[in-house]
Each structure stands twice: as C-alpha cells, then as structure tokens.
A protein has these predicted regions:
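C-terminal substrate-recognition "lid" of short-chain dehydrogenase/reductases
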Residues: 219-243, 248
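Canonical Rossmann dinucleotide-binding motif of NAD(H)/NADP(H)-dependent dehydrogenases/reductases
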Residues: 2-33, 172
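Short, small/polar-rich loop/turn modules that mediate ligand/substrate recognition or access, typified
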Residues: 177-182, 236-239
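Catalytic Tyr-X3-Lys loop
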Residues: 78, 86, 97-119, 140-141, ...
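Catalytic Tyr-x(3-8)-Lys segment
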Residues: 109, 202-222
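Alpha-helical segment proximal to the catalytic Tyr-Lys
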Residues: 124, 173-175
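Conserved mid-core segment of classical short-chain dehydrogenase/reductases
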Residues: 86-105, 124, 128-136, 154-157, ...
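Residue(s) in the substrate-gating loop at a strand-loop-helix junction
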Residues: 145
C-alpha cells in the first residue's frame, strides 16, 4: 500500500505507541484520525500533525462507528492501528482475596473487545473501498504484548486480553481475505511508554538491561516503523510479530 493520501485510524493515539505511529503515518502523507479517551492530549497531537481527533471508548459500538464515519468523510479509509489499552496488575489470589472480577472484565472489554470492535467496524467500511491495483482494500494492525506468551505474576487479566488478540489474528485475516483486507498483530516487548516512565529510574534501567539486544527500552518509533512496513508489504497477513529484542519474561 502507498500510504500517502490514504486515511488511517489510530486508537490510543494521544500518547505512547499510538502517538508515535500517528506522527509517522502523517509524515508519510497520511490523513490520520486519532481515537482516544484523552481529549486534551489527543486534540493536541491531532492538531500538531494536521489530523483529526474523536473522543472514543473503543469498546463502544456508537463511539467506534463515529470514528469510522469521521475517517470515511476524509477520504479512503485504508488503515487501522489498534493501540488503545490498559494494563492492570493483580494476582489471582492476593492478600485481600481473589482477583476482582470487575477488573478482569474491564481489561478484556477494553483490550480485546475494544480491538475487535474497531476491527469489525473498519473492515465493514474498507470492504466497500474501490480496490488498489493489488486488490487490497485495507490493512489492520492490532497491539498484543509479549505478555500474551510470557505472562508474569499479576498479569492474568492482561495476558488473557492480549492472548485473545493473538488468537484472533489469523481467523480474522482468513475471514477478510476475500475482501482484500489484511490483518496483522504486533506484540511489543518492554517499551518506553508513559506507563513505564512512571516507574523509578532504577527499575527502568533494570528492565532495559534485561533485553538481550539491543539492551534498551523499545521506542514508539520502533513500533511505528514496523507498522509502516506492514502497511507497505502486501505479503504480511495473518501473523503476529514479536518486537522485543529477543527478551523472554521471567515469572516476576
């Protein structure tokens, strides 16, 4: 796909991996719609890249459809990047009792159901696109995590939500093959995001040192570069790519 002139939706685009991806897509000539709950930050990012912002709870059918409608009003919607998500930490049984079921449910709702909600709505719109010369009508990228494979203590909810994203990658790609729509997933390792930067510096340094090579935290640009390559490489479909510097997480 030639990115220039196409319309892309980036959920969670107000910060972190989503913001980095939105900025890189814009630098390549894309029209970007940022969908996020953080209105002030999202609006600021959208304004700085000449894009659009729509406040969105990705698990809401109404909110998701509003984002897709806005994107389609700008031109040909050809790409989705699902970066919106939460990362709660709670043990199955802790000092205060069993894992809060509401917290587990919320994590699944935002991370897994939210990702699928945006996929299904974007795919519906993309299926009506006039195909490119290659037959392609759109590309969708979701964000899992290496926690889907190497979940640590306290990550039952988070790992379940990201494992669900991994599990639905191939069947969705197969579902949408006849529509000329590709579906991919990126599973990031330890990345420098606002959540991680809230940790003490010594914790950040220890996490970075645990990455075999390069021994550093991943950056939003690392993620964005891979997302751009996925959009541009027509043979990438139905696969999960670990972007982790070869790290494998220990139990804690």
């Amino acid at each position: 796909m030639d990115i220039a002139g196409k319309v892309f939706i980036v959920t969670g685009g107000a910060s972190g991996l989503g913001e980095g991806t939105a900025r890189m897509l814009s630098s390549k000539g894309a029209k970007v719609v940022i969908a996020d709950m953080q209105a002030d930050k999202g609006t600021a990012v959208a304004t700085s890249i000449g894009g659009e912002f729509v406040k969105c709870d990705v698990s809401s059918e109404e909110d998701g459809q509003a984002v897709v409608t806005r994107a389609c009003s700008l031109g040909k919607l050809m790409g989705l990047v699902n970066c919106a998500g939460i990362a709660p930490a709670e043990k199955t049984v802790g000092k205060s009792g069993p894992h809060a079921l509401a917290l587990f449910s919320k994590c699944i709702t935002v991370n897994l159901i939210g990702s699928f909600n945006m996929i299904r709505l974007c795919a519906d719109a993309m299926s009506r696109n006039e195909p490119e010369a290659t037959g392609e009508r759109g590309v969708m990228i979701s964000t899992a995590s290496i926690a889907a494979f190497d979940g640590q203590i306290g990550q039952a909810a988070y790992s379940a939500s990201k494992g669900g994203i991994v599990g639905m990658t191939l069947p969705i790609a197969r579902d949408l093959a006849r529509n000329g729509i590709r579906n991919m997933t990126i599973a990031p390792g330890i990345f420098g995001t606002p959540m991680l930067f809230s940790f003490p510096q010594e914790v950040q340094d220890a996490l970075a040192a645990g990455v075999p090579f390069p021994s550093r935290l991943g950056t939003p640009d690392d993620y964005a570069k891979l997302a751009v390559h996925i959009f541009e490489n027509d043979m990438l479909n139905g696969e999960v790519i670990r972007l982790d510097g070869a790290i494998r997480l220990a139990p804690r």
